[in-house]
Amino acid sequence: MIEADRLIAATGPREREEIQDRAIRPVSLADYIGQPSVREQMELFIQAARGRNESLDHTLIFGPPGLGKTTLANIIAEEMGVSIKSTSGPVLERPGDLAALLTNLEPHDVLFIDEIHRLSPIVEEVLYPAMEDFQLDIMIGEGPAARSIKLDLPPFTLVGATTRAGMLTNPLRDRFGIVQRLEFYSTADLATIVSRSAGILGLPLDPEGAFEVARRARGTPRIANRLLRRVRDFAEVRAKGHITKPIADLALNLLDVDERGFDHQDRRLLLTMIEKFDGGPVGVDSLAAAISEERHTIEDVLEPYLIQQGYIMRTPRGRVVTRHAYLHFGLNIPSRMGDMPVVDEFLDAVDD
């Protein structure tokens, strides 16, 4: 399975969707909906940095895909009144790639590195003195004639984004003065986002229709906006373009997105655990083989939302479905589950 092929994928949009996404992205903290703690803190930090005429401290933003890490990075640059240069960890293959970006920054500019956990060790080593001392150490020549020279860099702000904060090395993580975690959005916040996007795109949308789209969007703005575009297609063809709750419900059912925001892949994972592994515990490798998926697809794509919603637990012995999964499919809850610990006790447990 390719994550980008899922309608409810939280990965980046396709090229055509990306153009529309840029039009509906907020460009200031005042327009930024949700994440109240992050918004309040960043407003404070930015105001303080501007008052001192300094660069904002290096900032790490982490959380599940589609929650607005790139959007927040662009807002930081906009609020600071500086330019932003964007790249990603896999693109920076050699130290020279990073050096070219750093030497072209203006004072107080923002350098945004997405997927920063995928930086190669050799590039990461070059980044340390740049972050700490605003200096670039580069090697000139080869062999015995090689020598190191230092280049002074203008003060800048590195904004790193990652979905896998645990994969960052300690030296890199410790160099970020500001660390922000983005959480899944509430349905109310997503409904506000959907209504705002519909207004920008000129779509007639009832509040109840916005809420219906929002509650199936898995707590993720990117998914909410993608579902809105598909519901718009349905409404334009079959409902004269007006999106109401019944129209949104019909459209999303047609698109195989159920009331919990699950699609076919989510339901297949849960049913496989119930029917083939008696609800678990089951190891992730066995589960991957059973549904013909890669291990990382289960860990990075399918599991996070199911765990966050309490449908799957990670235990030291493997994955286990909860009673919520049985209830979702209208199945009888096994009697043995009456003795199971409360779901919340396991939500943060990690297995192999």
UniProtKB/Swiss-Prot annotation:
SMART domains, alphabetized: AAA
Keyword set, alphabetical order: ATP-binding, Cytoplasm, DNA damage, DNA recombination, DNA repair, DNA-binding, Hydrolase, Nucleotide-binding
Function text: The RuvA-RuvB-RuvC complex processes Holliday junction (HJ) DNA during genetic recombination and DNA repair, while the RuvA-RuvB complex plays an important role in the rescue of blocked DNA replication forks via replication fork reversal (RFR). RuvA specifically binds to HJ cruciform DNA, conferring on it an open structure. The RuvB hexamer acts as an ATP-dependent pump, pulling dsDNA into and through the RuvAB complex. RuvB forms 2 homohexamers on either side of HJ DNA bound by 1 or 2 RuvA tetramers; 4 subunits per hexamer contact DNA at a time.
Cellular component annotations (GO), alphabetically ordered: cytoplasm; Holliday junction resolvase complex
Pfam families in UniProt: AAA_lid_4 (PF17864), RuvB_C (PF05491), RuvB_N (PF05496)
Catalyzed reactions per annotation: ATP + H2O = ADP + phosphate + H(+)
Chain residues that bind ATP: I24, R25, G66, K69, T70, T71, E132, D133, F134, R175, Y185, R222
Positions of Mg(2+) binding: T70
Annotated segments matching region Small ATPAse domain (RuvB-S): 186-256
Region (Head domain (RuvB-H)): 259-352
Classification via InterPro entries: AAA+_ATPase, AAA_lid_4, DNA_helicase_Holl-junc_RuvB, P-loop_NTPase, RuvB-like_N, RuvB_C, WH-like_DNA-bd_sf, WH_DNA-bd_sf
CDD domains: AAA
GO biological process: DNA recombination; DNA repair
Cellular location(s): Cytoplasm
Region (Large ATPase domain (RuvB-L)): 4-185
Organism: Pseudomonas fluorescens (strain ATCC BAA-477 / NRRL B-23932 / Pf-5)
NCBIfam families, A to Z: PRK00080.1, ruvB
Family the UniProt entry places it in: Belongs to the RuvB family.
Residues holding DNA: R295, R314, R319
HAMAP family: DNA_HJ_migration_RuvB
Name used for this protein in its record: Holliday junction branch migration complex subunit RuvB
